[in-house]
Structures are given as structure tokens and as C-alpha cells.
């Protein structure tokens, strides 16, 4: 007996008005993730995934392109307001926030969540080049 054709249902995107942009700016790369208030990821992009390799990956321009791509990925959710959480000392901190602002999001507040040890692990030895 022939099986009935299976129709794929189109997933309905939930509408989210407020989101949280998590920016992880390391010395080597910048990762931008936009989540809803509960922390469920809606979209993400990286400088390396945006076509930058090697030392170009750790530039402010690469971080800006990653932020633009992430903003484009979450446009369909209807996010208007963004809360920004910045982590890390990388060169892409400022340019990522500027790119998100230019993408049409209203940035409500910016928080630095860089982990600072209370004299935790011993740091690695100094580089000798």
C-alpha cells in the first residue's frame, strides 16, 4: 500500500521584542550570539565564520562584519531592543556594539561580564620569542 506523502510543516518563528547580545571578544576571534531573555540562542556569527582567517580574524572590522551577519540572522524574530553583554579583552568590543546599533537595534544597556579571577589559577609563563 502506498504511503501518503509527508508534508513538512513550516516552523513558525516566535516573535521576540527584547533580546540579549552576548559578545565574546578574545584576542584571536570575536563571537556574537543573540539570545532571548531566557538565554535561548536565536542566532550567532563569528569573525572566522565570516570569511576572515589568521590575523585578519582578530580585527575590529571582522568583528563588525560578524555583528552585521548575526543581526541579519535574527531580523525575522522582530527584535527591537538589545541588552549587550561584553566578555573578553579583544579588539572587537567597540566595533561590534556600533555595528549592532547601526543594524537598527535599540541598545538598552551595556554590561561587561569579563571573568576576573580573585587570585585563582596561576597564569601561563611569559612568552620568549
Curated annotation (Swiss-Prot):
| Secretion signal, residue range per the UniProt entry | none
| Example of a GO cellular component annotation carried by this entry | ribonucleoprotein complex
Q: Does the keyword Ribonucleoprotein apply?
A: yes
Source organism, top-level taxon: Bacteria
Query: InterPro entries from the xrefs?
Result: Ribosomal_uS11, Ribosomal_uS11_bac-type, Ribosomal_uS11_CS, Ribosomal_uS11_sf
Q: Which GO terms describe its molecular function?
A: rRNA binding; structural constituent of ribosome
Query: Which cysteines are cross-linked by disulfides?
Result: none
Q: Which UniProt keywords apply?
A: Ribonucleoprotein, Ribosomal protein, RNA-binding, rRNA-binding
Q: Which SUPFAM superfamilies match?
A: Translational machinery components (SSF53137)
Gene Ontology annotations of biological process type? translation
List the PROSITE patterns.
Answer: RIBOSOMAL_S11
Q: What does this protein do?
A: Located on the platform of the 30S subunit, it bridges several disparate RNA helices of the 16S rRNA. Forms part of the Shine-Dalgarno cleft in the 70S ribosome.
- Describe its assembly: Part of the 30S ribosomal subunit. Interacts with proteins S7 and S18. Binds to IF-3.
Identify its protein family.
Answer: Belongs to the universal ribosomal protein uS11 family.
PANTHER family recorded for this chain? Answer: 40S RIBOSOMAL PROTEIN S14/30S RIBOSOMAL PROTEIN S11
* Protein name per UniProt: Small ribosomal subunit protein uS11
- The coding gene here is rpsK
Amino acid at each position: 500500500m502506498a504511503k501518503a506523502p509527508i508534508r513538512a510543516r513550516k516552523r513558525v518563528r516566535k516573535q521576540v521584542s527584547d533580546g540579549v547580545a552576548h559578545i565574546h571578544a578574545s584576542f584571536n576571534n570575536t563571537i556574537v550570539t543573540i539570545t532571548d531573555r531566557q538565554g535561548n540562542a536565536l542566532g550567532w556569527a563569528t569573525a572566522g565564520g565570516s570569511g576572515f582567517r589568521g590575523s585578519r580574524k582578530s580585527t575590529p572590522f571582522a568583528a563588525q562584519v560578524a555583528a552585521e551577519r548575526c543581526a541579519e540572522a535574527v531580523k525575522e524574530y522582530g527584535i527591537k531592543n538589545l541588552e549587550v553583554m561584553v566578555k573578553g579583552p579583544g579588539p572587537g568590543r567597540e566595533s561590534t556594539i556600533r555595528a549592532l546599533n547601526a543594524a537598527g537595534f535599540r541598545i538598552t544597556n551595556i554590561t561587561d561580564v569579563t571573568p576576573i579571577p580573585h587570585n585563582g589559577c596561576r597564569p601561563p609563563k611569559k612568552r620568549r620569542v
